């Protein structure tokens, strides 16, 4: 224990005397800064995560290998099929959802839920919540009777 203490004191003395630590300069032209630099601009005091800034949206669905945003998926993919009257089972197969077990983890699950909500509104004129649409898909649409 005493040997470690002596070694620690000796190392500290050598580093302090040798100039390995930050130096203090008395000249006015030289200044060592440690810490934050003050700024006169009004800024937020909280840190903010950097924004993406490139204008790209995150992929919401991937259909036939093409990544699409939510707006593109609804406009270019779901609305034309809704206008054609495509049923939900056919759309699920077209999107690549083939089994009930893996359906909720599929990359196009949210698009299928959105389509069921749109389909229900077009046919019945009633709005459906997302949780209700997910339940209907799992218990009534993606069943063994429908070959899922």
UniProtKB/Swiss-Prot annotation:
It is found in: Secreted; Host cytoplasm; Host cell membrane. One of its GO terms (cellular component) is membrane. Keywords: Glycoprotein, Host cell membrane, Host cytoplasm, Host membrane, Membrane, Secreted, Signal, Virulence. The keyword Methyltransferase does not apply. Residues 1-22 form the signal peptide. Its main location: secreted. This is RxLR effector protein SFI7. The lineage of its organism: Eukaryota, Sar, Stramenopiles, Oomycota, Peronosporales.
């Amino acid at each position: 224990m005493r040997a470690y203490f002596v070694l620690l004191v000796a190392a500290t003395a050598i580093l302090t005397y040798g100039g390995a630590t930050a130096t203090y300069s008395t000249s006015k032209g030289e200044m060592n800064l440690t810490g934050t630099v003050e700024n006169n601009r009004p800024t937020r005091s909280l840190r903010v995560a950097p924004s993406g800034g490139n204008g790209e949206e995150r992929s919401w669905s991937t259909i036939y290998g093409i990544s699409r945003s939510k707006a593109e998926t609804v406009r270019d993919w779901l609305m034309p099929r809704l206008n054609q009257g495509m049923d939900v089972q056919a759309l699920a197969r077209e999107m690549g959802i083939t089994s009930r077990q893996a359906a909720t983890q599929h990359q196009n699950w949210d698009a299928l839920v959105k389509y069921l909500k749109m389909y229900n509104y077009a046919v019945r004129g009633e709005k459906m919540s997302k949780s209700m649409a997910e339940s209907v898909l799992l218990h009534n649409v993606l069943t063994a009777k429908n070959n899922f």
